[in-house]
């Protein structure tokens, strides 16, 4: 990868993962082409201010993808399950990979999900496993698959946990279940590594995490960062199922099996210090 010459197309550039990867690449003076549906939005303007080339595009619009891929050396591919839905996410991920291969992209980085390869039975894990299969089979000169676990950023999302305002961490996970988590900035660091060390990481499939905590301990850590008392409030899984069958299956899998990242050894291998939940929470934008 030639710094200042090779262009990396980053999809989801104004979202959590894409934004983190774009910022990391830009911090090392790499050329970033940021794909977004809202090129005039504040997040896109912020990336442009850091030096990114912001281009409009939709993952469901093959024409805009073909245009964005022209001359790209690398691609960072991310899709949003909760926004697009399981079937659309799979379609988008496969199409982007196929178009990137057709466009002559040299290195393709796909961000999947932790344990996607383990036959979890979770719909939004299984569809990513099928996208992974597509990436493997296309014959890219090189590719890397990243598999991040549960995002720490989920805790600051009102739609994910509205009960935080009531002093409760409400989720359908057992009190004694340890949950592996990762800060999106750590994903960005691994994304940067995947591009800068593309030869060494060719065909590597890497599960990544930064910390592991039970829900009562998570409530204690988040409450301390928020400056208030926060109580873990377990939610019956059948109540979760009424909201989302997919989400319920995932939570049941967390209790029964769970992610399996060796955090310390992974950190040592890649030279990326893991962000702890406490460190992340201390800097999080609590409202």
Language model: regions and residue ranges:
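Oxidoreductase cofactor-interface core, primarily capturing Rossmann-like NAD(P)-dependent enzymes
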Residues: 1-46, 60-63, 67-72, 80-91, ...
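Compositionally biased, low-complexity repeat tracts
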Residues: 8-11, 53, 163, 254, ...
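A hydrophobic C-terminal alpha-helical subdomain
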Residues: 24, 225-226, 237-287
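Short, conserved active-site loop motifs that form the nucleotide-linked donor/cofactor pocket
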Residues: 51-52, 143
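Cofactor-binding loops of NAD(P)H-dependent oxidoreductases
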Residues: 57
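Short, basic/glycine-rich phosphate-binding loops at helix/coil junctions
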Residues: 75-77, 259
């Amino acid at each position: 990868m030639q710094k200042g010459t090779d262009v990396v197309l980053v999809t989801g550039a104004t979202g959590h993962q894409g934004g983190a990867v774009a910022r990391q690449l830009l911090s090392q003076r790499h050329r970033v082409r940021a794909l977004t549906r809202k090129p005039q939005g504040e997040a896109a303007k912020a990336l442009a201010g850091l030096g990114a080339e912001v281009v409009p595009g939709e993952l469901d619009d093959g024409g805009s993808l073909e245009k964005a891929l022209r001359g790209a050396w690398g691609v960072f591919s991310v899709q949003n399950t909760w926004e697009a839905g399981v079937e659309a996410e799979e379609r988008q991920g496969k199409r982007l990979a196929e178009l990137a291969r057709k466009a002559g992209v040299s290195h393709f980085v796909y961000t999947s999900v932790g344990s996607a390869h383990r036959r979890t039975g979770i719909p939004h894990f299984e569809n990513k496993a099928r996208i992974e299969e597509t990436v493997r089979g296309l014959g890219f000169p090189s590719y890397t698959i990243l598999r991040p676990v549960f995002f720490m950023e989920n805790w600051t999302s009102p739609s994910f946990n509205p009960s935080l305002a009531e002093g409760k961490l409400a989720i359908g996970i057992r009190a004694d279940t340890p949950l592996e988590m990762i800060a999106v900035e750590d994903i960005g660091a691994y994304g940067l590594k995947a591009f800068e060390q593309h030869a060494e990481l060719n065909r590597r499939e890497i599960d990544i995490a930064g910390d592991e905590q039970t829900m009562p301990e998570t409530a204690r850590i988040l409450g301390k960062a928020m400056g208030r008392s926060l109580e873990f409030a377990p939610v019956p899984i059948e109540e979760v199922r009424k909201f989302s069958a997919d989400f319920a299956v995932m939570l049941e899998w967390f209790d029964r099996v769970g992610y399996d990242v060796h955090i310390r050894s992974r950190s040592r291998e890649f030279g990326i210090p893991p962000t702890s939940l406490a460190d992340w929470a201390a800097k999080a934008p609590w409202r």
